[in-house]
Curated annotation (Swiss-Prot):
It is found in: Cytoplasm. GO terms for molecular function: arginine binding; DNA binding; DNA-binding transcription factor activity. The keyword Repressor applies. InterPro entries: Arg_repress, Arg_repress_C, Arg_repress_C_sf, Arg_repress_DNA-bd, WH-like_DNA-bd_sf, WH_DNA-bd_sf. This is Arginine repressor. It comes from the Bacteria. Regulates arginine biosynthesis genes. GO terms for cellular component: cytoplasm. Keywords: Amino-acid biosynthesis, Arginine biosynthesis, Cytoplasm, DNA-binding, Repressor, Transcription, Transcription regulation. Pathway: Amino-acid biosynthesis; L-arginine biosynthesis [regulation]. PANTHER family: ARGININE REPRESSOR. Belongs to the ArgR family.
């Protein structure tokens, strides 16, 4: 467990430097720090786990970093605290979330699937597009989604 903790600390320390633009660069840096068994898939999982996002640093380079303004959303965070707004037009529903929470919530929505009227989702950092199934009305799907976010998990 101690080795995992030191890996996590080294990983977070590297991301705070805001100079790594690819997962392979992070892998190389961790290997140079003595974590020789690290690979790209492990780094990818860690990026998701810690809520890392790619943004432009002060040099205008796209780099990975940890969002500072909010805690990392987890599956134990109440959904109502992560969802900021729900809006729609005649064919799509748009959900605005706290930074870093969109992919977590989109994954939850995707798991509901076609039976609940969700054909699919596309998530960025803080925005989700939801496409309803052919036979589901926008109003019905909004009611389902709103109920999910209002429930206490």
């Amino acid at each position: 467990m101690e080795k995992l903790d030191s890996l996590n600390e080294a990983f977070k320390s590297l991301l705070r430097e805001e100079k790594f633009g690819s997962q392979s660069e992070i892998v190389t840096a961790l290997q140079e720090m003595g974590f020789e068994h690290i690979n790209q898939s492990k780094v990818s999982r860690m990026l998701s786990k810690f809520g890392a996002v790619r943004t432009r640093n002060t040099k205008m380079e796209m780099v990975y970093h940890l969002p500072a303004e909010l805690g990392i959303p987890t599956t134990s965070s109440p959904l109502r605290n992560l969802v900021i707004d729900i809006d729609h037009n005649e064919s799509l529903i748009v959900v605005r979330t706290s930074p870093g929470a969109a992919q977590l919530i989109a994954r939850l929505l995707d798991s509901m699937g076609k039976a609940e009227g969700i054909l699919g989702t596309i998530a960025g950092d803080d925005t989700i597009f939801i496409t309803p199934t052919r036979d589901t009305s926008i109003s019905t799907l909004i009611a389902t989604i709103t109920e999910l976010f209002d429930s206490s998990l």
